[in-house]
UniProtKB/Swiss-Prot annotation:
Location of the protein in the cell: Cell inner membrane
Name used for this protein in its record: Inner membrane transport permease YadH
PROSITE patterns (UniProt xref): ABC_TM2
Example of a GO cellular component annotation carried by this entry: ATP-binding cassette (ABC) transporter complex
Lineage, highest ranks first: Bacteria, Pseudomonadati, Pseudomonadota, Gammaproteobacteria, Enterobacterales
Entries under InterPro entries matching the protein: ABC-2_transport_permease, ABC2_TM, ABC2_TM_bact-type, ABC_2_transport
Keywords per UniProt: Cell inner membrane, Cell membrane, Membrane, Transmembrane, Transmembrane helix, Transport
Organism: Escherichia coli (strain K12)
Keyword set includes Nucleotide-binding: no
Keyword Secreted annotated: no
UniProt topological domain (Cytoplasmic) ranges: 44-52, 116, 160-169, 245-256
Residue intervals annotated with topology Periplasmic: 1-22, 74-94, 138, 191-223
Amino acid sequence: MMHLYWVALKSIWAKEIHRFMRIWVQTLVPPVITMTLYFIIFGNLIGSRIGDMHGFSYMQFIVPGLIMMSVITNAYANVASSFFGAKFQRNIEELLVAPVPTHVIIAGYVGGGVARGLFVGILVTAISLFFVPFQVHSWVFVALTLVLTAVLFSLAGLLNGVFAKTFDDISLVPTFVLTPLTYLGGVFYSLTLLPPFWQGLSHLNPIVYMISGFRYGFLGINDVPLVTTFGVLVVFIVAFYLICWSLIQRGRGLRS
């Protein structure tokens, strides 16, 4: 039985990876171009007029945040659009009636989102080498933060895909929730620059912890304790996973 589950999992993974690789011009190139513009405008043009941040140039400071931003948006978008597309075309019904556990379905879609997020993250990292020298303080924290964040936002994208009723619903969360939280998550600034009230308010933003942990992996500096960073990641991953599992298990909005 486990062999059959493994075959099902690999099949979903293969389908999801083939899906975004087949249209790589739409899925991989745009985020690379967008991040390149960020590097040029904020890093070179504006960054040259801004002083050092915690002993690093402004460009070095924002690179980890921009990489994380690309991972978050692409992991989320991949699963949200793919799962809703399967639901819209009623392909998901075939998967639900097949002898495939809900855990396998979730792992398959999340695996595809993680793959796209990491792939884009690697491409953006490669582009950043044209602007700043490569520096890693801890590979363990870089890899751990990157993978956990990609898993979390893949689950969030799956949740969006379950609730979405139209294709417009797929863009609502990224536009009104994800983008503001990312920009206010410390990508372009350190929390220490904010007044105490806004520092405290920023700690309610979960993306702050992810960017802080990822920046520590590269530069060895962080705005929040690492234990808190990984605690927040694990709690959100478990919560989102259980919600997704419950909704798919009950077929909420999936069965006609």
